[in-house]
Regions:
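Active-site environment of divalent metal-dependent phosphoester hydrolases
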Residues: 66-69, 100-103, 130-142, 200-203, ...
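His/acidic metal-ligating clusters that form di-metal
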Residues: 191-194, 205-344
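Active-site neighborhood of phospho(di)ester-bond hydrolases with catalytic His/Asp-centered motifs
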Residues: 59-61, 92-96, 128-134, 228-230, ...
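Active-site-proximal beta-strand elements of phosphoester/diester hydrolases
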Residues: 54-67, 189-199, 229, 354-360
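Binuclear metal-dependent phosphoesterase catalytic core
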Residues: 31-47, 51, 179-181, 306-309, ...
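N-terminal active-site segment of His-dependent metallophosphoesterases
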Residues: 28-111, 116
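N-terminal secretory signal peptides and thylakoid transit peptides that target proteins
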Residues: 2-18
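Extended active-site neighborhood of metal-dependent phosphoesterases/phosphodiesterases
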Residues: 31-49, 112-225, 245-262, 266-268, ...
């Protein structure tokens, strides 16, 4: 069991009831525990709207560092330097799978792989926060670090530029909220929830946020506009209007096939931009493409947790999934994910929640020949803008 996980009943019993006020309450009010067990261990003066009422930040995901040679991949280094020059962000949100493979997640090697990434943030005086993906800590044993140990290295290397948003009581590591305030104010004007979506479920497939994480969100969210960041996308993305059924493929390949038992089954159609991508639904899979109005690229099927995992007691709160909770509370304006390396779409679903995916920031694993990130501009009126930023050989920048 994760040492950061507490009993759900104990957590809920210890949580304080929020007063009916807008915004998030202060860290000290959220939990009846010592200050060391709350959140917000960072310089809030660095995370503020500027004089124009704007706050700019980047989402960086799936870097998949695999070299211990003390330098970043060329494409990642250039991607960050060009993005820093163009957007001048105050913050980078790292949404998991920053390292991978036995080599770079092993003790001694992890530090060598990570430090060049942190160093480029410090060089440009950009703050950063981190949560984890399925690959960061998939190896276990005395030769590999836990998520918590990795988090501590981010904190150690980042120093004053590390935004320690973590709430230690919650399942996983790298869970919490980064508050963005107006200059001269201590009241958050916009919140960034950065959460650990786990790695792999016990019953197969990917994991999802747990009951205590959802309960905590409902307790602290208030009505302040917010964005949500985690590594693994929620399955609701497939069924809430962002995708439409792909045109039916006809001809010989579409004919019904017979199994060895003589049963009729639908043929497996190859996924692609013409045939669609096989999205998981509660009743099976459907070949789908981006709906009209959804911007960006869909280049692979989404990889959320299984519905049976996502809806079970360990991953719901009072019968509500994470998405149900967002709809109930009403403050989440958008939710952004990594995990699916070549997807970079962005669109509003039928319930008014904006969903986006951000592609891999390196060529270390499968990719489409571009390395990318996502740039955000928050506005003091509770709105925001976002766009993707890419580099590709010969590394000329492009954005859309």
């Amino acid at each position: 069991m994760d040492k950061n996980k507490i009993n759900r009943r104990d957590f809920l019993a210890g949580a304080v009831t929020l007063a009916a006020v807008a915004g998030c309450r202060s860290a000290k009010e959220k939990f009846p525990v010592s200050e060391d067990c709350t959140r917000c261990h960072y310089d809030a003066e660095k995370i503020r709207f500027n004089a124009k009422g704007e706050f700019r930040f980047l989402q960086l995901t799936d870097v998949h560092l695999k070299s211990c040679e003390g330098k970043l991949p060329e494409e990642t280094d250039l991607l960050l330097r060009q993005a820093f020059a163009q957007y001048k962000p105050a913050l980078v949100v790292l949404t998991g799978d920053i390292v991978w493979c036995k080599l770079t997640t092993a003790k001694g090697n992890f530090e060598k792989a990570l430090k060049p990434l942190v160093d480029i943030f410090i060089e440009h005086k950009v703050c950063f926060c981190v949560t984890f993906g399925n690959h960061d800590s998939e190896y276990h044993g005395p030769d590999w670090y836990t998520r918590q140990e990795m988090y501590d290295f981010y904190k150690k290397f980042g120093g004053e530029y590390f935004v320690d948003h973590d709430v230690p009581e919650l399942t996983g590591c790298g869970n919490g909220v980064v508050e963005v305030c107006l200059d001269g104010s201590s009241k958050p004007q916009f919140n960034l929830f950065v959460m650990d979506s786990g790695a792999y479920a016990k019953d197969g497939g990917y994991d999802a946020c747990r009951t205590d994480q959802i309960a905590w969100y409902e307790k602290v969210c208030g009505s302040t506009p917010a964005l949500w960041f985690q590594h693994i996308i929620v399955p609701d993305v497939n069924v809430t209007g962002l995708f439409v059924d792909a045109p039916r493929v006809t001809g010989k390949s579409d004919a019904a096939e017979k199994t060895a038992k003589g049963e009729t089954q639908e043929p497996k159609i190859k996924e692609g931009p013409d045939t669609g991508y096989r999205m998981s639904w509660p009743d099976g899979g459907r070949m789908m493409l981006l709906a009209p109005g959804v911007k960006g690229d869909l280049m692979e099927h989404t990889c959320p947790p299984r519905w049976i995992t996502y809806r079970n007691d360990a991953h719901t709160y009072k019968g509500r999934t994470l998405y149900d909770s967002w709809c109930k509370m009403g403050n989440i304006k958008g939710a952004y994910f990594g995990h699916d390396h070549t997807n970079s779409f962005d669109g509003v679903d039928k319930n008014g929640i904006r969903f986006g995916m951000t592609k891999t920031a390196s060529f270390s694993t499968y990719n489409d020949g571009t390395a990318g990130l996502r740039a955000f501009t928050l506005h003091a009126d509770g709105t925001y803008d976002t766009e993707t930023f890419f580099v590709k050989p010969p590394f000329k920048k492009s954005s859309k």
